[in-house]
């Protein structure tokens, strides 16, 4: 089962509002520039196409939608600035932020100003555990990813030596700690636990330590730029250990950086829905605009569907809190991801993750 990987090139029309006269404005906050721009571009493409499709059918409750994009560059200060600008423009609905380090501070600003947000990709448990009324997701949580990866390791690789490394950021450390906790509860102890500094180019000190520990696998909590470099430098030092990671590995840029060093690396990711009947309309619409139906794009598309459901159930878009309550009612919501239900803190309550593997430059199921 193949999964399309991230394309950083399909940004068609995503930096422009769609109409000056739309009734409901949906803001998008995510990295259109910067080291993880691939994630933001992909998610934004999904949002744009979903909005196009809703508008072709008359919008939501007869009101047209408009998309306005705010680039956070994956930098917290820029994300906060984007949120304040969005609030100043009176926007009440947001898809995003894309990364967890932005989602946490931005969610506070949006909550204080009665703005409902639905992130297609922020997985930190802290985002929803604080009990803010305005937080929704179309992805799972780090603890769910960590648990899933650890259980997979225990089931298939229990006798292998594994180290755990993270990038000290909200997303990466959250993944690593969740993996470690579940791994240890399952009776497996890592041979080493440590961290690296994101943005650096030389990880020789960490590579030497991992080589010394004779690791068979390394669980890496972090994004693809550091993962790719770590893999490449491990191979250069004669260490054949694949990485295991989270959905930050789901981009062709990982293979571009690491090359064949990425062969066999595993990662948890949202369950591939491209073969499901529920996803076919979205896939057709994405492809019609030359946009690959990739994970973040699918999640972005689904985020608009969830907002549309809530607005329709609430009767209007005038009260974002009423829209949030409608989404969290427990009723199944038909989306591109299939039927999903929400708990009272905005988390999806159904299974959302699977295990995947890099093989010959492509992503295949590892189940």
Task: Provide a role label for each language-model segment.
Residues 2-7, 21-367:
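Extracytosolic ligand-binding ectodomains
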Residues 17-19:
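N-terminal signal peptide c-region/cleavage motif recognized by signal peptidases
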């Amino acid at each position: 089962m193949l999964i399309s990987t991230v394309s950083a090139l399909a940004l068609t029309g995503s930096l422009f509002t769609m109409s000056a006269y739309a009734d409901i404005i949906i803001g998008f906050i995510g990295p259109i520039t910067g080291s993880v721009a691939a994630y933001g571009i992909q998610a934004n493409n999904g949002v744009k196409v979903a909005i196009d499709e809703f508008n072709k059918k008359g919008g939501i409750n007869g009101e047209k939608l408009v998309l306005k994009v705010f680039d956070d560059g994956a930098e917290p200060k820029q994300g906060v600035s984007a949120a304040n600008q969005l609030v100043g423009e009176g926007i009440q609905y947001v898809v995003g932020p894309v990364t967890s380090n932005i989602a946490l501070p931005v969610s506070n600003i949006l909550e204080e100003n009665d703005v409902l947000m639905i992130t297609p990709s922020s997985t930190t448990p802290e985002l929803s555990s604080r009990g803010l009324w305005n937080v929704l997701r179309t992805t799972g949580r780090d603890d769910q990813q960590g648990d899933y990866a650890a259980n997979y390791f225990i089931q298939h690789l229990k006798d292998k030596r594994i180290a755990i490394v993270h990038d000290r950021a909200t997303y990466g450390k959250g993944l690593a700690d969740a993996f470690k906790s579940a791994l240890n509860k399952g009776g497996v102890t890592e041979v080493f636990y440590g961290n690296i500094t994101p943005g650096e180019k030389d990880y020789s000190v960490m590579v030497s330590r991992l080589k010394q520990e004779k690791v068979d696998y390394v669980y890496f909590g972090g994004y693809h730029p550091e993962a790719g470099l770590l893999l490449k430098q491990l191979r250069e030092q004669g260490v054949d250990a694949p990485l295991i990671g989270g959905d930050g590995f789901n981009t062709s840029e990982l293979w571009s950086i690491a090359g064949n060093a990425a062969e066999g690396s595993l990662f948890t990711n949202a369950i591939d829905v491209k073969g499901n009947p529920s996803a076919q309309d979205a896939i057709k619409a994405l492809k019609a605009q030359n946009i690959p139906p990739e994970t973040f794009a699918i999640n972005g598309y689904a985020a608009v569907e969830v907002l549309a459901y809530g607005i329709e159930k609430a009767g209007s878009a005038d009260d974002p809190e009423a829209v949030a309550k409608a989404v969290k009612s427990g009723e199944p919501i038909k989306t591109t991801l299939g039927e999903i239900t929400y708990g009272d803190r905005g988390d999806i309550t159904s299974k959302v993750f699977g295990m995947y593997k890099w093989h010959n430059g492509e992503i295949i199921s590892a189940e």
